[in-house]
């Protein structure tokens, strides 16, 4: 939700969600659900591309190439399910003559560089790693697990990292 909202706030009109991962349902599915829910609610044109780990990155390159017309990408905002994928997509786009953030804005997800004391390598949705760790320990140490909620949502935040056109 937050990534799509940020991209729209920065002027993007046609968004793309990219994911590579397991075929087993997981957290990145929730990222896609939030992305799609925001886009539908805001009337924003969007597409998604879901790949399995075994597919590798080649299908992303083919998809991106097929969506470049007269030197322009059909999308002006892309949300990738991880920061690592964001950096791979940025590299592919650069090789195809598409620049971030000038031609397309990219946002990743995890923000682990920030928690390691480094500046983010891409604009990202930051997970609250210390709070996540504390919550996990609390759950593990809880004697009576019968009243645990089926879902615990922790607050995420946005951090600019050079792949979006953030106001100064």
Question: How does the language model describe each region?
Answer:
Residues 12-14, 37, 57-61, 100, ...:
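Secondary-structure boundary/capping motif
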Residues 14, 46-48, 99-105:
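Short acidic capping loops at alpha-helix termini that bridge into adjacent secondary structure
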Residues 1-2, 18-63, 79-87, 109-111, ...:
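Hinge/beta->alpha junction and helix N-cap segments in small-molecule ligand-binding domains
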Residues 10-15, 73-76:
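Short acidic/polar active-site loop segments enriched in Thr and Asp
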Residues 13, 31-32, 157, 161:
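Short, cationic motifs built from Arg/Lys/His that form the positively charged side of catalytic pockets
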Residues 65-168:
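Flexible loop/turn connectors
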């Amino acid at each position: 939700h937050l990534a799509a909202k940020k991209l729209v706030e920065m002027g993007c009109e046609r968004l793309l969600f990219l994911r590579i991962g397991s075929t087993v349902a997981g957290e990145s599915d929730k990222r896609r659900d939030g992305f799609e829910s925001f886009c539908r609610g805001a009337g924003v044109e969007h597409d998604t591309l879901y790949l399995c780990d075994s597919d590798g990155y080649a299908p992303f390159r083919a998809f991106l190439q097929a969506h470049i017309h007269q030197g322009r990408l059909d999308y002006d905002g892309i949300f990738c399910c991880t920061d690592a994928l964001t950096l791979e997509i940025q590299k592919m786009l650069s090789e195809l003559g598409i620049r971030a953030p000038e031609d397309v804005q990219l946002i990743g997800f995890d923000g682990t560089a920030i928690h390691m004391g480094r500046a983010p390598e891409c604009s990202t949705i930051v997970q609250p790693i210390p709070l996540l760790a504390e919550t996990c320990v609390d759950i593990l140490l809880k004697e009576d697990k019968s009243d645990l909620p089926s879902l615990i949502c922790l607050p995420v935040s946005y951090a600019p990292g050079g792949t979006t056109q953030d106001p100064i």
